[in-house]
A protein has these predicted regions:
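Conserved glycosyltransferase catalytic-site signature
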Residues: 128, 163-167
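Beta-strand segments within the central parallel beta-sheet cores of soluble alpha/beta enzyme folds
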Residues: 124-127, 189-191
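Short alpha-helix plus adjacent loop in nuclease-associated cores
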Residues: 114, 126-142
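Acidic two-metal-ion nuclease catalytic site recognized across multiple nuclease folds
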Residues: 1-7, 152, 171-202
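Conserved non-catalytic scaffold segment of RNase H-like nuclease domains
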Residues: 1-123, 143-161
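Short glycine/threonine-rich catalytic loop with a Thr-x-Gly-x-Asp
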Residues: 138, 160-164
Length: 202
């Protein structure tokens, strides 16, 4: 059952988005979705798609992500990909949604759901940026940026500001964090969901 589920049995869906701007409220949209589903340290599913946001991509965003208007010209709209993405997330009472700086990605996904009049599932959301601050000290890392953590945990994929690469890097960071949490006796999903306080000082 969920109440005793060990983290090694938990399915985590690690998501990263690229977007056309900083906030949905400013008219920005999703340009790319990358998601990796993992359980017990194994990748059991991958979701990747470009999304046509219906707005032009600024030179700044193209420079940051390498994504151009031409790449998105024939891409599906968020309305076309959203149902299959929600299906990929899986059952909300079992799977955990993970993102680095989760409020950003989840904010865009919730805005898309609202715009499409699509029910947003109530998955537990784990933010690797926040979790890293609980298990690491300033002596370990200078900041909790994805690239810094990916290097610290020896991630096999380097973040590139492309959705799937960043999601894969976040998977390795998540696994590193879970290993650290085990050292604090946190091994089950209910314990994981309750991690709210810093576990290390400094």
């Amino acid at each position: 059952t969920i109440s005793t589920m060990h983290l090694s049995q938990t399915t985590f869906v690690v998501v990263d988005l690229e977007t056309s701007g900083a906030a949905p409220s400013m008219g920005a949209g999703i340009t790319e979705i990358g998601a990796v589903k993992v359980r017990g340290g194994e990748v059991i599913g991958v979701f990747e798609t470009f999304v046509n946001p219906g707005v032009e991509i600024s030179p700044f965003i193209t420079q940051l992500t390498g994504i151009t208007d031409q790449m998105l010209a024939n891409a599906p709209t968020i309305g076309q990909v959203f149902p299959s993405f929600i299906e990929f997330l899986g059952p909300e009472n079992e799977n955990v949604l993970v993102a680095h700086n989760a409020p950003f990605d989840v904010g865009f996904l919730k805005a898309a759901a609202a715009h499409l009049d699509y029910p947003w599932p109530n998955h537990h959301v784990a933010d690797t940026a926040r979790l890293a601050r609980y298990v690491l000290t300033r002596d370990d890392v200078i900041n909790c940026k994805l690239a810094t953590l990916a290097e610290f945990f020896g991630a096999t994929t380097s973040p590139t500001h492309r959705a799937l690469d960043d999601a894969r890097a976040t998977v390795d960071v998540l696994h590193g964090i879970i290993e650290r949490l085990g050292g604090f006796g946190i091994t089950t999903l209910p314990q994981f969901k309750k991690v709210k306080k810093r576990l290390v000082s400094g």
